[in-house]
Swiss-Prot record:
One of its GO terms (biological process) is ribosome biogenesis. Residues 4-165, 180-357 form the EngA-type G domain. It comes from Rickettsia conorii (strain ATCC VR-613 / Malish 7). GTPase that plays an essential role in the late steps of ribosome biogenesis. It comes from the Bacteria. Belongs to the TRAFAC class TrmE-Era-EngA-EngB-Septin-like GTPase superfamily. EngA (Der) GTPase family. Signal peptide: none annotated. The gene is der. Associates with the 50S ribosomal subunit. This is GTPase Der. Residues 358-443 form the KH-like domain. PANTHER family: GTPASE DER. GTP 1 binds at residues 10-17, 57-61, 119-122. The keyword Repeat applies.
Amino acid sequence: MTKQIITLVGRPNVGKSTLFNRLSIRKKAIVHDLPGVTRDRKYTDGKIGSFEFLLIDTPGLDENPNSMGERLIEQTTKAILEADLICFMVDGRSGILPDDKLLSSFVRKYNKPAILVVNKCEKAFDFDKEYYKLGFDSMIAISAEHGTGLIDLYDEIIAKLPEEESIKTNIADPIKGDCLQIVVSGRPNAGKSTFINALINDERLLTGPEAGITRESIEIDWQYKNNHIKLIDTAGLRKKSTITESLEKLSASDTINSIKFANTVILMIDALAPLKQQDLNIASHVVHEGRSIVIVVNKWDLVKESEKEAFQEEFYYQINTHLPQVKGIPVLFISAINKQNIEQVLDACLKIYKIWNKKITTSKLNEWLNFTTEAHLLPLQKGGRRVRVKYMTQTKTRPPTFKLFSNNPEKITDSYTRYLVNNMREAFDMPGVPIRFIYVKTKNPYV
């Protein structure tokens, strides 16, 4: 089957070549010597996850398209016309510049599927209104240099491209033929490396009683029940002693980046160490990144039988109290050193990964929405008009994300959103995964 084509467009110095090399199957992008291709337009075979495509890098355009050199316009125009999808790149550090606005207009007139890719976002990034003014309905923040955000970019690319059979197959069965990336995270000395060694029946990872033996993230390719799995052992996350507990201050940035690229995160808890705020910070970070999560309490064999029931009751209470936004997180109690219940952890990961990839038809969504909103109406506003959520559709998976159309979305309270999300979990059997709602105002506020 002919590969689909993705074209990178943007002004100079926004990181097109860096992303081009990052996505290239080869470590260094090689220009294809194709007939009729000049040296100004570079081609390479690209890959994200299991999806392969042809990638085009275009010359940087930094002037008004009406006065640009004819050759640059010609090269970029040809690359746009060839494309099945355009990644329009801007620099997240410098923000939106006049050239970005001019170029976005130049690109949009071709009516090609497009994603706004905000590069150089090494830290958490919020899109302000200037980015929306560029006119793209899909926006992703990445760091091409560090490789962060590529899973989100992959999701948007799959959502935007025409649904070829090969892509449909990957979405319908997200595990077979794909690589499930499982990050094992937690505080130091919780037993992460011991757990992975027990799974693969091999002393691949150095273990011991000293906290912090693992100094960097280590990847292991593995097969489980005919599924290709990449297990990633991470350095234990601990707070810097001189800083507050805020999530941004967590040390071990390599571990934080591994979580960004994970499909599922196993949060390992030491049964002999009380549940701490740091554990909850890690779990909250996983949820904030939109990843699926499984909580594993290790060293369960060392807890007295007479204390286990009370331990579990208190543990579930703490998780449900501090992580109400993801009700139903799988929690398993294991002994890694004795290989007790360890396969149950992988089974839970496979199950929640499928939920994380769940796609619901628009008709079923709106049938549920009508019933749920009628059962619990939003209050009347001034003038006697009632706020209503009229329609919804699923815009992406990983995590399940939904766009809801309302006559007055700013009046929808957080408590009402929680009501909808919790109801959706039950109705569509979606425990333990982040569910995201995006509210959009309908053009006519009176309907």
